[in-house]
Amino acid sequence: MANWARTDYRIEGNQKDLQEIYNLCKAFDNSERPVMEDGASKDWEGNIILALGIEKGESYLRGFIQSCELSDGLLCIEAEEAWGATDFRHLLEKHYNGMKVYYIVEEDGCEVYATNDIDGKYFAYHFIVASCIEGE
């Protein structure tokens, strides 16, 4: 059984491109579009990738979109992903010219904490402390 990681994405790019991704997220979430592979969940990240015509090949796509919001030219996606960040961000950046996908991932079980936002543009904290006090 997988350890589930929370991954938050902040996606910058052309407004038309961001709107396209957002529209697909909402269409799958509202069951307005059928899933792209037999047995797939409507919130599987791969639906977006395949609907965009991207060849996923051997890409690691074990994530499920929990929320998707587009506001002020920024697309915000929250996902649950198995073990850590998936290839979702890489596939989007390769598909769209000028797109930048910032992410932060937290998976407590295997202590996976990572980000590519080194300047803190969207994810300002650089440290995460998990502590447990015996008896509490």
Regions found by a protein language model. Name each.
Residues 35:
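Pyridoxal 5′-phosphate
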